[in-house]
Regions:
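An active-site-proximal structural segment forming one wall of the substrate-binding cleft
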Residues: 1-16, 20, 24-67, 108-115
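Extracellular glycoside hydrolase catalytic/binding regions
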Residues: 47, 54-57, 61-64, 68-170
Length: 170
């Protein structure tokens, strides 16, 4: 009850998914990115989001829920050289690793939004990450039925290094 007691607002952020959404060290296991290839793990993630919304959705201290942190797409995977930058700590587990498609991430966000909104009031925010492709989201979830959706972007120098300063500045 600290958030309510001290007037704080909390953003719950799922920072990783089973078998990682990005292959980064902060994605759970460096060098592995297989989450989107495993339907049971995708469903697990959606169920966790739903349970969080069910448990905390009506709490005054909850500002919102971020669906997943920094999922990586094919384009960013190539530009960053993820497999060289983040060598696999478990080469056996990393076998078959590949990035998420933008289409998969978009569908996951739509599914997550629907599952969250079953329990999360409209005044609470649903936060989605731009997957390091800020321009790709210009018209996504713009329809009136999507309430209080926030696009999260992380501007890292390593992205400017890999993708060019133009996208970073824009």
């Amino acid at each position: 009850n600290w958030a309510e007691r001290y007037g704080l607002k909390i953003l719950i952020d799922l920072h990783t998914a089973p078998d990682s959404q990005n292959g980064f060290d902060n994605g759970g296991i460096s060098g592995v990115c297989k989450w989107s290839q495993e339907p049971e793990e995708v469903e697990f993630e959606l169920t966790v989001l739903e349970r969080l919304a069910q448990r905390y959705g009506r709490r005054e201290g909850l500002w919102g829920i971020e669906v997943i942190n920094e999922p990586i797409t094919e384009e960013t995977w190539e530009h960053m050289g993820v497999q060289e930058r983040y060598p696999a700590v478990d080469p056996v587990k990393a076998a078959g690793t590949k990035p998420n498609t933008l289409e998969f991430i978009r569908q996951f966000y739509l599914d997550a939004y629907d599952r969250l909104r079953k329990y999360l009031p409209e005044e609470k925010y649903v936060v989605i990450h731009d997957a390091f492709l800020l321009k790709a989201w210009k018209d996504f979830m713009r329809e009136d039925k999507y309430k209080n959706v926030v696009l999260d972007t992380h501007q890292y120098l390593m992205m400017a290094e890999g993708m060019g300063c133009e996208q970073t500045v824009e």
